[in-house]
UniProtKB/Swiss-Prot annotation:
This is Ketosamine-3-kinase. GO terms for cellular component: cytosol. Belongs to the fructosamine kinase family. Keywords: ATP-binding, Kinase, Nucleotide-binding, Phosphoprotein, Transferase. The gene is FN3KRP. The ATP-binding domain is structurally related to aminoglycoside phosphotransferase family. PANTHER family: FRUCTOSAMINE 3 KINASE-RELATED PROTEIN, KETOSAMINE-3-KINASE. Its EC number is 2.7.1.172, 2.7.1.-. It is an enzyme of class 2 (transferase).
Length: 309
Protein backbone atom coordinates (compact mmCIF):
# COMPACT_ATOMS: atom_id res chain seq x y z
CA UNK A 1 0.00 0.00 0.00
CA UNK A 2 2.81 2.44 0.89
CA UNK A 3 4.39 1.92 -2.55
CA UNK A 4 1.03 2.48 -4.30
CA UNK A 5 0.45 5.74 -2.40
CA UNK A 6 3.99 6.95 -3.08
CA UNK A 7 3.55 6.36 -6.81
CA UNK A 8 -0.01 7.65 -7.22
CA UNK A 9 0.15 10.66 -4.91
CA UNK A 10 3.67 11.69 -5.93
CA UNK A 11 4.99 11.45 -2.35
CA UNK A 12 8.58 10.73 -1.41
CA UNK A 13 7.70 9.26 2.00
CA UNK A 14 4.64 7.30 3.17
CA UNK A 15 4.31 5.65 6.59
CA UNK A 16 1.32 3.96 8.21
CA UNK A 17 0.20 5.52 11.50
CA UNK A 18 -1.53 3.85 14.42
CA UNK A 19 -4.87 5.31 13.34
CA UNK A 20 -7.21 2.77 11.80
CA UNK A 21 -10.94 2.24 11.66
CA UNK A 22 -13.69 0.50 9.79
CA UNK A 23 -17.42 0.26 9.30
CA UNK A 24 -19.84 -2.37 8.04
CA UNK A 25 -18.52 -2.11 4.48
CA UNK A 26 -14.87 -0.95 4.28
CA UNK A 27 -11.71 -0.75 6.39
CA UNK A 28 -9.57 2.36 6.79
CA UNK A 29 -6.08 3.41 7.86
CA UNK A 30 -4.18 6.70 8.11
CA UNK A 31 -0.79 7.32 6.52
CA UNK A 32 1.72 10.10 7.11
CA UNK A 33 3.16 11.46 3.87
CA UNK A 34 5.50 14.37 3.13
CA UNK A 35 2.37 16.13 1.78
CA UNK A 36 0.37 15.65 4.99
CA UNK A 37 -1.65 12.88 6.63
CA UNK A 38 -4.20 11.00 4.52
CA UNK A 39 -6.94 8.50 5.33
CA UNK A 40 -7.25 5.47 3.05
CA UNK A 41 -10.42 3.37 2.80
CA UNK A 42 -9.97 -0.12 1.39
CA UNK A 43 -12.58 -2.53 0.03
CA UNK A 44 -11.67 -5.88 -1.60
CA UNK A 45 -14.91 -6.32 -3.60
CA UNK A 46 -14.79 -6.19 -7.40
CA UNK A 47 -17.47 -3.45 -7.42
CA UNK A 48 -15.60 -1.29 -4.87
CA UNK A 49 -14.34 1.19 -7.49
CA UNK A 50 -17.90 2.14 -8.45
CA UNK A 51 -18.77 2.56 -4.75
CA UNK A 52 -15.73 4.76 -4.04
CA UNK A 53 -16.18 6.84 -7.21
CA UNK A 54 -19.74 7.54 -6.04
CA UNK A 55 -18.45 8.53 -2.60
CA UNK A 56 -15.79 10.79 -4.13
CA UNK A 57 -18.40 12.53 -6.33
CA UNK A 58 -20.68 12.92 -3.27
CA UNK A 59 -17.95 14.46 -1.11
CA UNK A 60 -16.93 16.79 -3.96
CA UNK A 61 -20.53 17.97 -4.47
CA UNK A 62 -21.02 18.65 -0.73
CA UNK A 63 -17.66 20.46 -0.53
CA UNK A 64 -18.68 22.84 -3.32
CA UNK A 65 -21.71 24.04 -1.32
CA UNK A 66 -19.45 25.34 1.47
CA UNK A 67 -22.14 24.47 4.04
CA UNK A 68 -21.13 21.46 6.16
CA UNK A 69 -17.63 20.06 6.59
CA UNK A 70 -16.65 16.80 4.85
CA UNK A 71 -13.25 15.18 4.30
CA UNK A 72 -11.70 16.33 1.02
CA UNK A 73 -11.42 13.35 -1.37
CA UNK A 74 -8.11 12.95 -3.22
CA UNK A 75 -8.14 9.87 -5.47
CA UNK A 76 -9.71 6.46 -6.16
CA UNK A 77 -7.12 3.77 -6.92
CA UNK A 78 -7.08 0.06 -7.72
CA UNK A 79 -5.92 -1.80 -4.62
CA UNK A 80 -2.97 -4.18 -4.73
CA UNK A 81 -4.49 -7.67 -4.74
CA UNK A 82 -7.93 -6.58 -5.96
CA UNK A 83 -10.67 -4.16 -4.97
CA UNK A 84 -10.19 -0.42 -4.63
CA UNK A 85 -9.04 2.30 -2.27
CA UNK A 86 -10.29 5.84 -1.68
CA UNK A 87 -7.67 8.32 -0.50
CA UNK A 88 -8.95 11.38 1.35
CA UNK A 89 -7.92 14.07 3.78
CA UNK A 90 -7.29 12.77 7.31
CA UNK A 91 -9.39 14.47 9.98
CA UNK A 92 -9.06 14.17 13.76
CA UNK A 93 -12.67 13.46 14.68
CA UNK A 94 -14.53 12.55 17.84
CA UNK A 95 -18.12 11.62 18.69
CA UNK A 96 -20.65 14.37 17.90
CA UNK A 97 -21.60 16.05 21.18
CA UNK A 98 -21.17 19.81 21.52
CA UNK A 99 -21.91 20.67 17.87
CA UNK A 100 -25.28 18.92 17.31
CA UNK A 101 -27.26 22.16 16.85
CA UNK A 102 -24.60 23.50 14.48
CA UNK A 103 -24.91 20.29 12.43
CA UNK A 104 -28.70 20.74 12.24
CA UNK A 105 -28.28 24.30 10.96
CA UNK A 106 -25.53 23.37 8.50
CA UNK A 107 -27.47 20.37 7.18
CA UNK A 108 -30.43 22.68 6.51
CA UNK A 109 -28.02 25.04 4.69
CA UNK A 110 -26.87 22.09 2.55
CA UNK A 111 -30.49 21.24 1.72
CA UNK A 112 -31.33 24.88 0.91
CA UNK A 113 -28.21 25.46 -1.20
CA UNK A 114 -29.70 24.42 -4.56
CA UNK A 115 -32.93 26.36 -3.88
CA UNK A 116 -30.88 29.49 -3.19
CA UNK A 117 -28.90 28.92 -6.40
CA UNK A 118 -32.19 28.81 -8.31
CA UNK A 119 -33.40 32.04 -6.71
CA UNK A 120 -30.07 33.70 -7.50
CA UNK A 121 -30.21 32.62 -11.17
CA UNK A 122 -33.75 34.02 -11.47
CA UNK A 123 -32.65 37.34 -10.02
CA UNK A 124 -29.60 37.46 -12.29
CA UNK A 125 -31.74 36.72 -15.35
CA UNK A 126 -33.32 40.14 -14.89
CA UNK A 127 -29.99 41.92 -14.37
CA UNK A 128 -28.06 43.31 -17.33
CA UNK A 129 -24.27 43.13 -17.42
CA UNK A 130 -23.62 41.34 -14.16
CA UNK A 131 -19.98 40.63 -13.40
CA UNK A 132 -18.61 37.14 -13.94
CA UNK A 133 -15.30 35.90 -12.65
CA UNK A 134 -16.08 32.99 -10.37
CA UNK A 135 -17.05 29.53 -11.51
CA UNK A 136 -20.83 29.22 -11.49
CA UNK A 137 -22.59 26.22 -10.04
CA UNK A 138 -25.73 25.44 -12.03
CA UNK A 139 -29.16 25.15 -10.44
CA UNK A 140 -30.27 21.49 -10.54
CA UNK A 141 -33.92 21.24 -11.60
CA UNK A 142 -34.30 17.44 -11.54
CA UNK A 143 -33.92 14.54 -9.12
CA UNK A 144 -30.94 12.18 -9.39
CA UNK A 145 -27.15 12.40 -9.61
CA UNK A 146 -24.47 12.27 -12.31
CA UNK A 147 -22.97 8.99 -11.06
CA UNK A 148 -24.06 5.82 -9.28
CA UNK A 149 -23.81 6.09 -5.49
CA UNK A 150 -24.03 3.21 -3.03
CA UNK A 151 -26.01 3.13 0.22
CA UNK A 152 -23.99 0.43 1.95
CA UNK A 153 -22.58 -1.60 -0.93
CA UNK A 154 -25.80 -1.72 -3.00
CA UNK A 155 -25.85 0.67 -5.97
CA UNK A 156 -28.58 3.32 -6.21
CA UNK A 157 -30.27 4.13 -9.52
CA UNK A 158 -29.64 7.87 -9.91
CA UNK A 159 -30.98 8.43 -13.45
CA UNK A 160 -32.41 11.95 -13.65
CA UNK A 161 -36.18 12.37 -13.25
CA UNK A 162 -38.46 15.42 -13.40
CA UNK A 163 -40.86 14.01 -10.80
CA UNK A 164 -39.79 13.16 -7.23
CA UNK A 165 -42.62 10.68 -6.56
CA UNK A 166 -41.73 8.75 -9.73
CA UNK A 167 -38.02 8.87 -8.82
CA UNK A 168 -38.58 7.61 -5.29
CA UNK A 169 -41.02 4.81 -6.16
CA UNK A 170 -39.17 3.54 -9.26
CA UNK A 171 -35.54 4.19 -8.39
CA UNK A 172 -35.43 3.73 -4.62
CA UNK A 173 -38.18 1.37 -3.43
CA UNK A 174 -38.73 -0.74 -6.57
CA UNK A 175 -35.08 -1.92 -6.88
CA UNK A 176 -35.16 -2.95 -3.19
CA UNK A 177 -38.46 -4.82 -3.68
CA UNK A 178 -36.99 -6.53 -6.75
CA UNK A 179 -34.14 -7.82 -4.56
CA UNK A 180 -36.58 -9.01 -1.89
CA UNK A 181 -38.58 -10.84 -4.56
CA UNK A 182 -35.46 -12.43 -6.04
CA UNK A 183 -34.03 -13.52 -2.68
CA UNK A 184 -37.13 -14.65 -0.80
CA UNK A 185 -40.19 -14.24 -3.05
CA UNK A 186 -41.94 -12.72 -0.02
CA UNK A 187 -45.56 -12.61 -1.18
CA UNK A 188 -46.87 -10.44 1.67
CA UNK A 189 -44.19 -7.80 1.08
CA UNK A 190 -44.96 -7.71 -2.65
CA UNK A 191 -48.74 -7.43 -2.08
CA UNK A 192 -48.27 -4.60 0.42
CA UNK A 193 -45.98 -2.77 -2.01
CA UNK A 194 -48.58 -3.09 -4.80
CA UNK A 195 -51.19 -1.50 -2.51
CA UNK A 196 -48.81 1.18 -1.23
CA UNK A 197 -47.84 2.38 -4.71
CA UNK A 198 -51.42 3.57 -5.25
CA UNK A 199 -51.33 5.60 -2.02
CA UNK A 200 -47.96 7.34 -2.45
CA UNK A 201 -49.16 10.31 -4.58
CA UNK A 202 -51.64 11.26 -1.81
CA UNK A 203 -48.73 11.81 0.60
CA UNK A 204 -47.34 14.54 -1.67
CA UNK A 205 -50.50 16.46 -2.55
CA UNK A 206 -49.95 20.26 -2.76
CA UNK A 207 -46.27 19.88 -1.85
CA UNK A 208 -43.63 21.71 -3.88
CA UNK A 209 -40.32 19.84 -3.77
CA UNK A 210 -37.20 21.61 -4.97
CA UNK A 211 -34.28 19.18 -5.47
CA UNK A 212 -31.90 19.32 -2.50
CA UNK A 213 -28.38 17.89 -2.43
CA UNK A 214 -28.52 15.11 0.18
CA UNK A 215 -25.83 13.27 2.13
CA UNK A 216 -28.01 10.20 1.54
CA UNK A 217 -26.96 7.98 4.47
CA UNK A 218 -26.98 10.29 7.48
CA UNK A 219 -27.13 7.98 10.49
CA UNK A 220 -25.24 8.55 13.74
CA UNK A 221 -22.23 6.51 12.57
CA UNK A 222 -21.59 8.91 9.67
CA UNK A 223 -21.39 12.13 11.71
CA UNK A 224 -18.70 13.41 14.07
CA UNK A 225 -17.02 16.65 15.08
CA UNK A 226 -13.56 18.15 15.18
CA UNK A 227 -12.30 21.23 16.99
CA UNK A 228 -14.01 23.57 14.50
CA UNK A 229 -17.46 21.96 14.32
CA UNK A 230 -19.45 19.06 12.86
CA UNK A 231 -18.18 16.71 10.14
CA UNK A 232 -20.21 14.32 7.97
CA UNK A 233 -18.73 11.50 5.90
CA UNK A 234 -19.51 8.28 3.97
CA UNK A 235 -22.15 10.00 1.80
CA UNK A 236 -24.34 8.38 -0.87
CA UNK A 237 -25.50 11.64 -2.39
CA UNK A 238 -28.19 12.57 -4.89
CA UNK A 239 -30.62 15.43 -5.45
CA UNK A 240 -33.87 14.55 -3.69
CA UNK A 241 -36.47 15.67 -1.14
CA UNK A 242 -34.84 17.18 1.94
CA UNK A 243 -37.18 15.20 4.24
CA UNK A 244 -35.60 11.95 2.98
CA UNK A 245 -32.39 12.83 4.86
CA UNK A 246 -34.13 12.73 8.25
CA UNK A 247 -35.46 9.17 7.84
CA UNK A 248 -32.34 7.18 8.72
CA UNK A 249 -31.28 9.91 11.18
CA UNK A 250 -34.32 9.02 13.27
CA UNK A 251 -34.04 5.22 12.93
CA UNK A 252 -30.88 4.47 14.89
CA UNK A 253 -30.58 7.45 17.24
CA UNK A 254 -27.52 9.63 17.64
CA UNK A 255 -29.20 12.99 17.00
CA UNK A 256 -30.34 15.21 19.86
CA UNK A 257 -33.38 17.48 20.02
CA UNK A 258 -31.07 20.49 19.51
CA UNK A 259 -30.10 19.06 16.08
CA UNK A 260 -33.75 18.84 15.01
CA UNK A 261 -34.67 22.25 16.47
CA UNK A 262 -31.87 23.96 14.56
CA UNK A 263 -32.74 22.10 11.35
CA UNK A 264 -36.48 22.81 11.48
CA UNK A 265 -35.77 26.42 12.45
CA UNK A 266 -34.53 26.78 8.86
CA UNK A 267 -36.71 24.14 7.15
CA UNK A 268 -40.06 23.85 8.99
CA UNK A 269 -42.03 20.59 8.82
CA UNK A 270 -44.58 20.61 5.99
CA UNK A 271 -48.08 19.08 6.47
CA UNK A 272 -47.91 15.27 6.21
CA UNK A 273 -44.24 15.18 7.29
CA UNK A 274 -44.61 12.21 9.70
CA UNK A 275 -46.21 9.90 7.13
CA UNK A 276 -43.66 10.77 4.47
CA UNK A 277 -40.90 10.13 7.01
CA UNK A 278 -42.24 6.56 7.37
CA UNK A 279 -42.22 6.19 3.59
CA UNK A 280 -38.57 7.30 3.53
CA UNK A 281 -37.68 4.96 6.40
CA UNK A 282 -39.13 2.12 4.33
CA UNK A 283 -36.21 2.46 1.89
CA UNK A 284 -33.66 2.09 4.68
CA UNK A 285 -35.41 -0.90 6.30
CA UNK A 286 -35.60 -2.64 2.91
CA UNK A 287 -31.95 -1.76 2.23
CA UNK A 288 -30.98 -3.27 5.60
CA UNK A 289 -33.10 -6.36 4.83
CA UNK A 290 -31.20 -6.77 1.56
CA UNK A 291 -27.82 -6.17 3.23
CA UNK A 292 -28.20 -8.04 6.52
CA UNK A 293 -31.16 -10.40 6.24
CA UNK A 294 -34.77 -10.85 7.30
CA UNK A 295 -34.33 -9.34 10.78
CA UNK A 296 -35.53 -6.13 9.09
CA UNK A 297 -38.56 -7.74 7.42
CA UNK A 298 -40.95 -6.97 10.27
CA UNK A 299 -40.12 -3.25 10.32
CA UNK A 300 -40.43 -3.03 6.52
CA UNK A 301 -43.86 -4.70 6.52
CA UNK A 302 -45.13 -2.69 9.50
CA UNK A 303 -44.41 0.59 7.71
CA UNK A 304 -46.22 -0.60 4.58
CA UNK A 305 -49.22 -1.77 6.65
CA UNK A 306 -49.39 1.62 8.40
CA UNK A 307 -49.25 3.55 5.15
CA UNK A 308 -51.89 1.51 3.28
CA UNK A 309 -54.49 1.88 6.07
Amino acid sequence: MEELLRRELGCSSVRATGHSGGGCISQGRSYDTDQGRVFVKVNPKAEARRMFEGEMASLTAILKTNTVKVPKPIKVLDAPGGGSVLVMEHMDMRHLSSHAAKLGAQLADLHLDNKKLGEMRLKEAGTVGRGGGQEERPFVARFGFDVVTCCGYLPQVNDWQEDWVVFYARQRIQPQMDMVEKESGDREALQLWSALQLKIPDLFRDLEIIPALLHGDLWGGNVAEDSSGPVIFDPASFYGHSEYELAIAGMFGGFSSSFYSAYHGKIPKAPGFEKRLQLYQLFHYLNHWNHFGSGYRGSSLNIMRNLVK
